[in-house]
Amino acid sequence: MSTNFWELLQQHQGDLTKSGRTVAEYLVQHAAEAQYLSISSLARECQVAEATVFRFCRALGFEGYHEMRIALAQANATGVLVNQQEPAPDADTATLCEHASALFMTAINGTQNALSPQAVEQAVVLLHSARQVFCMGQGGSMAAANEICARFACITNKFRAVADSHMQVMAASLMTEQDVVLFVSYSGATRDLMETLRTAKANGAKVILITHYEDSPGAKLADIVLLCGAQESPLDSGSIPIKVAVLYVAEVLVLRYILDDKPGSTEAQERTTEALAVKLL
């Protein structure tokens, strides 16, 4: 679909229902913020049902919400409502360095504000009591899950990473109430995520989800939700600041985990450090 989002909205204004016009008015007034919202979040902000938002998208000619959100982000980036975080086309490298630094600091600060200390403490209780902890994700989120698994490997051998979506659901099918899933998903709304979490929950496993959307389908299945406050545009999928924000959450988990069992963690760190010493030249 090549037509600009705002042109489409103007063309189909007369086709919208009263509640559809409520959605349209919100998008006009909050265009920059709306491109980051999930369908459930947008519905809540507009005080309408998710089905109303979906019908709004179809009325404009989109297949669904995701396609509409991408079109909105494209319009924001190229139209009058320019993304203020985008560097100028002629920016020099020094400016780009400052820009990147600002993105990372914004991601970390946003996550610090969103992350619940109580949720972290509850998550660590589950991690300590677990027989096994399965670190999972898809795409760029799986890269972060691998990093989390590697970080915990210095202090415990109960963590394992499962990358393939088929292997994830297979692992979930063999879980028990002694197991924990630590799933990384920015959207909290992918088919593979939902399939794996449903299977894990059916077998009694606990679920910890690191996500940006506390009202996402995945969050509704999770026992504990750890919020990543960094915002990602649909046009910037896989951004590194998002991964850094996720790893910030992971580091808080690690620090709490260590302090809650300082003697055991210290011994484990000493043993793994000694084991790695022979690898150095």
Regions found by a protein language model. Name each.
Residues 2-7, 15, 22, 29-36, ...:
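HTH-adjacent hinge/linker in prokaryotic transcriptional regulators
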Residues 8, 26, 123-126, 171:
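CheY-like receiver
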Residues 118-130:
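Glycine-rich phosphate/diphosphate-binding loops that line cofactor/substrate pockets in enzymes
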Residues 128-248, 254-261:
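Glycine-rich phosphate-binding loops that contact phosphosugars or nucleotide phosphates
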Residues 263-281:
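A short, charged, Gly/Pro-tolerant segment at domain boundaries
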